[in-house]
Amino acid sequence: ETGKAVPGAPIAPRVAELHAEIYKNTDDIIIRNYQTPEAIALSKKGEPEKAYLDDFCQIAGSVVANVNWDPTSYRTDAVEAGKAASGRNAILVKGHGALCIGMNPYDADAVKLVLEKEAIAAMYAQLVLGTKNLGTLDRVIQRLVYKMKYSKQADKK
């Protein structure tokens, strides 16, 4: 049962709580935790990720939140993460990587792939002077168009 302690794995109830809050705030049914080097590097920035790449803003979200989560903390971290997931297909968890969210495992994996590309682009952007992420209006429009188009295609299947 969700929220009950698992012997030898004290973190499990906290993870269940985190997932429950995300499910409350999204229509998606798959949450995958990715702790790839790219995801961890991006999450360690500790700030929201404003997309450099168009496919990232379309698939993951125009701005992907970066939330704190401490498995020993009170419920507030999980609630914050759940709210941050609303309207997005990914959230960064500071120092822990990313949670990629989708309607099926393939969607969640696609989010992971673009998140890794975004992380690499963000690292290069720090090295190249004058590099800027996509503008706010550009990100929002791209995400909106993608969601509307993808939703219609998904409904047909």
What is each residue range found by the language model?
Residues 1-157:
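Glycine-rich flexible loops
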